């Protein structure tokens, strides 16, 4: 799973979890702005916007923040956001995938080059790293909301593929991307709390590197995660 490694200590994982929460809110706001740009500011006639507004409410984003960004999105000065993906090789042959949502691709590309210049690794051509990963749907279930054995029973019942326990705060229910909406709806119908659902990358194989390379990779990943436009960083380091 993204960010999980034997070289990541408790302090690193706690800081990453706190940082990730902010990234989730930021991503939702960018999705909201993009939905308005594509389909207009009225959720009654813009189904995509309606879904994202509900998503924002589920994430406890304040209503005033939602309204402010709806107005912001309607401004001609506000650029639209687009998804971009970067692939890198870190130390010891570790593959890294970076997903970002940006209103300025040149700025984001520059930030990526700075990260590599400062922390090492190399940016590579599209497809050079992706073949080591599989695209999966993921539903995030708070660990304090359900017992793992009970959730596993539900996972089997709804036909999901796997249950991942690596995340610090959530169980992650994995499924085929095309089944994500259905799996989430079935879990919710069974009383399971799903705080987030999205598509993620899961490594097909992991790379075991030494402590020096492991720590260097974590430093690179931490730098990448702090880039404003970056939403998620995936790697295949053991």
From Swiss-Prot:
One of its GO terms (biological process) is regulation of DNA-templated transcription. Keywords: Cytoplasm, DNA-binding, Transcription, Transcription regulation. It comes from the Bacteria. SUPFAM superfamilies: YebC-like. It is found in: Cytoplasm. Its main location: cytoplasm. GO terms for molecular function: DNA binding. Pfam families: TACO1_YebC_N (PF20772), Transcrip_reg (PF01709). One of its GO terms (cellular component) is cytosol. PANTHER family: TRANSCRIPTIONAL REGULATORY PROTEIN YEBC-RELATED, TRANSLATIONAL ACTIVATOR OF CYTOCHROME C OXIDASE 1. Belongs to the TACO1 family. This is Probable transcriptional regulatory protein CF0838.
